[in-house]
A protein has these predicted regions:
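General structural signal for secondary-structure boundaries
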Residues: 1, 105, 127, 167-173
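Glycine-rich anion/phosphate-binding loops
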Residues: 1-9
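Active-site phosphate/pyrophosphate-binding segments
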Residues: 132-173
Length: 173
């Protein structure tokens, strides 16, 4: 939560758009960035994210399972893009079963074809690459007029982010 809180604060301060990839099952009891948490909902993350409404463009992309807090962030984005292989629900299998509502596999909860019909998903992509292309195109609509355009050397980025998207990396480098 602390990283996303910081991102939201910077986006608000500098009026920057945010593209968030929401795959995941939400918080876990063993999370260490919030030590006084019972349910994890008294953190500023969700209020900060919601507070960006009308200030910063928020685009959410999902590929795979997206439950709990991740689904809340996805649902509150201005534009929601999901792949055909997405399952999005406010509760995952453990919460549903723990609530006494039965046992379900993750693929039985919020499949993309249902969420598209319900209006949860704005754009359905065939895969994450196409979803990212959709986000890039949407961002281009909000950049305004460009008289002169420059970009820093992007080659250094290939060594900053790990090739496996599930690996951690030093965020302050």
């Amino acid at each position: 939560h602390m990283k996303l809180d910081r991102i939201c604060e910077k986006a608000k301060k500098y009026k920057l758009p945010i593209v968030i990839f929401t795959e995941g099952g939400g918080g876990r009891p063993g999370d260490t960035d919030i030590t006084t948490s019972i349910a994890g909902l008294h953190v500023p993350t969700f209020a900060l994210w919601g507070g960006l409404t009308g200030r910063c463009l928020r685009i959410a992309i999902n590929n795979g399972f997206c439950f709990a807090g991740n689904a809340a962030l996805f649902g509150c984005a201005d534009i929601r893009i999901a792949t055909k292989n997405s399952w999005i629900g406010m509760a995952g299998p453990a919460m549903i079963e723990g609530g006494g509502l039965g046992s379900y596999s993750p693929k039985e909860i919020g499949p993309s074809e249902v969420n598209e019909k319900n209006g949860v998903i704005d754009l359905v992509a065939k895969d994450e690459a196409e979803a990212t292309d959709f986000a890039k195109k949407i961002l281009s609509y909000f950049q305004g007029d460009l008289v002169d355009w420059k970009i820093e050397d992007q080659a250094q980025l290939k060594d900053i982010m790990p090739k496996n998207r599930k690996w951690s990396y030093p965020i302050r480098n």
